[in-house]
């Protein structure tokens, strides 16, 4: 992976590199490969992730169809 450093601006180059790595999923993969994961645990994790994705997709679909209220967007500067 390459990032150009312009005008000796290393901070900006590091920020761009981190963004690229985040998009590629490298940090997540490093976290997962940090220790051995048994095949049964891997299957269980992948199944749980698939269920989570399906549930999220169904929720978004219901919101688009108007069956669920849209989540209100937080106002800037307020908690």
Curated annotation (Swiss-Prot):
Region of interest: Disordered: 58-79
InterPro entries the record matches: Ribosomal_bS21, Ribosomal_bS21_CS, Ribosomal_bS21_sf
A Gene Ontology BP annotation from the UniProt entry: translation
Keyword Cell membrane part of the UniProt annotation: no
Any one Pfam family match given in the protein's UniProt record, by short name: Ribosomal_S21
Cellular component terms (Gene Ontology): ribonucleoprotein complex; ribosome
Record flagged with keyword 4Fe-4S: no
Gene3D superfamilies for this protein: Ribosomal protein S8 (1.20.5.1150)
Coiled coil: none
Annotated keywords: Ribonucleoprotein, Ribosomal protein
Alphabetized GO MF terms: structural constituent of ribosome
Record family assignment: Belongs to the bacterial ribosomal protein bS21 family.
Protein name (Swiss-Prot/TrEMBL): Small ribosomal subunit protein bS21
